A protein has these predicted regions:
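Sec-dependent N-terminal signal peptides
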Residues: 4-14
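Residues in flexible loops and secondary-structure boundaries
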Residues: 9, 39, 88-89
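Short N-proximal segments of mature Sec-exported proteins
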Residues: 20-79, 83
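Surface-exposed, polar helix/loop patches in the mature regions of secreted/periplasmic/lumenal proteins
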Residues: 74-102
């Protein structure tokens, strides 16, 4: 039984380590998809953005963007995605992070 627990814990911990840099979910959709969803559904995308930025804070550098509102974030991402419709959404969010945490 103890061997089973040790193997189980080792596999769970190793999966967490190897999956830390993998993007999942809405981040894999293209910018054109983000721009085409209804306003009510953009809340889901912006929730993904908040989670992604949080993960960047945990795994990489501490990000401190000041005076950035929810509406400003959404508007910036909409504008960027309008200009770059074929880029995946995660890259747009990375660009947003780069622009506002200089």
């Amino acid at each position: 039984m103890n061997k089973f627990i040790i193997i189980f814990l080792a596999s769970v911990c190793s999966n967490l380590t190897f999956s830390a840099d993998k993007v999942k979910g809405l981040g894999l959709s293209k910018c054109t998809t983000f721009n085409s969803v209804a306003i009510e559904e953009k809340v889901i995308y912006m929730s993904w953005v908040a989670g992604f930025i949080t993960s960047q804070n945990i795994f990489k550098d501490k990000l401190h963007a000041k005076n950035i509102t929810y509406n400003m974030s959404q508007s910036w991402l909409e504008s960027f995605c309008y200009k770059n419709p074929n880029i995946i959404f995660e890259r747009a969010v990375n660009k947003f992070i780069f622009e506002f945490t200089k």
